[in-house]
């Protein structure tokens, strides 16, 4: 079982234009600072946050209980001009877990409801479970793209790869998030290494972009992500010729 938390800024759209539209640079700064703040607080509890849409973020939170979430929620409310609500869900796959978390929060009102504030909606918590995360990157992007084509063209290709990965992984109950550079992370409980290898080969055939992936499996998101990083580094370093390499705690 994997546990996912949806973090949603309360009534954010209306707030950004009340009493008049706020400076866009200030909004971008606040969103970036809020994400960094949440990442720091969830990481201190072995969780991992993905910025997703910035006003809606998703976190893998195995090992975190109601009180952990409540403390983070209150901390944000004390220090920011906005508040956040959270929904927590658990399931066998990450997609189902985030769906349960979303439904739990949605049952308490819409994202732009003036009445909904600092809701903590729990659909389910994981007592004993695990987190499986894949760290995926593009082979040789620096030499083949970054150093020879315009920056925006490289960004376009990275976004295209993300689109293809998301379409294929969601069919397996897995999620995918861009984490910078040419890197993606996929919470993928229930996906076998052979299944991810098949997806990587399909993308190579379809859009001529070669990928590789390290998979980590551990009780918490932070540990699983670290193992995924180490597994990917073994591929990069030539310690294995596999395109998908697994490390477990």
UniProtKB/Swiss-Prot annotation:
Enzyme Commission code: 3.5.4.29
Keywords assigned by UniProt, alphabetized: GTP-binding, Hydrolase, Nucleotide-binding
A GO biological process held by the record: biosynthetic process
Single GO MF descriptor: GTP binding
Principal EC category: hydrolase
Entry keyword Cytoplasm: no
Record has Nucleotide-binding as a keyword: yes
Catalytic activity: GTP + 3 H2O = 2-amino-5-formylamino-6-(5-phospho-D-ribosylamino)pyrimidin-4(3H)-one + 2 phosphate + 2 H(+)
Family: Belongs to the archaeal-type GTP cyclohydrolase family.
UniProt function note: Catalyzes the formation of 2-amino-5-formylamino-6-ribofuranosylamino-4(3H)-pyrimidinone ribonucleotide monophosphate and inorganic phosphate from GTP. Also has an independent pyrophosphate phosphohydrolase activity.
PANTHER family hit by this protein: GTP CYCLOHYDROLASE III (PTHR42202:SF1)
Protein name: GTP cyclohydrolase III
Organism: Methanothermobacter thermautotrophicus (strain ATCC 29096 / DSM 1053 / JCM 10044 / NBRC 100330 / Delta H) (Methanobacterium thermoautotrophicum)
């Amino acid at each position: 079982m994997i546990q996912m938390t949806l973090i949603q800024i309360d009534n954010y759209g209306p707030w950004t234009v009340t009493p008049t539209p706020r400076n866009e640079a200030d909004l971008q700064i606040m969103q970036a600072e809020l994400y960094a703040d949440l990442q720091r607080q969830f990481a201190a509890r072995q969780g991992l946050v993905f910025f997703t849409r910035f006003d809606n973020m998703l976190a893998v939170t195995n090992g975190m209980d109601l009180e952990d979430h409540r403390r983070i929620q209150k901390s944000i409310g004390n220090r920011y001009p906005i508040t956040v609500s959270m929904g927590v869900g658990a399931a066998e796959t990450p997609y189902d877990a985030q769906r349960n978390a979303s439904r739990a929060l949605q049952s308490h009102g819409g994202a732009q409801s003036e009445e909904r504030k600092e809701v903590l909606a729990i659909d389910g918590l994981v007592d004993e479970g695990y987190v499986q995360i894949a760290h995926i990157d593009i082979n040789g992007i620096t030499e083949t793209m970054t150093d020879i084509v315009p920056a925006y063209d490289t960004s376009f290709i990275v976004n295209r790869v993300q689109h293809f990965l998301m379409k294929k992984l969601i069919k397996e109950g897995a999620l995918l998030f861009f984490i910078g550079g040419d890197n993606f992370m996929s919470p993928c409980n229930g996906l076998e290494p052979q299944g991810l290898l098949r997806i990587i080969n399909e993308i190579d055939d379809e859009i001529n972009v070669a990928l590789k992936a390290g998979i980590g499996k551990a009780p918490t998101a932070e540990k699983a992500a670290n193992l995924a990083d180490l597994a990917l580094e073994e591929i990069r370093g030539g310690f294995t010729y596999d395109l998908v390499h697994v490390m477990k705690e």
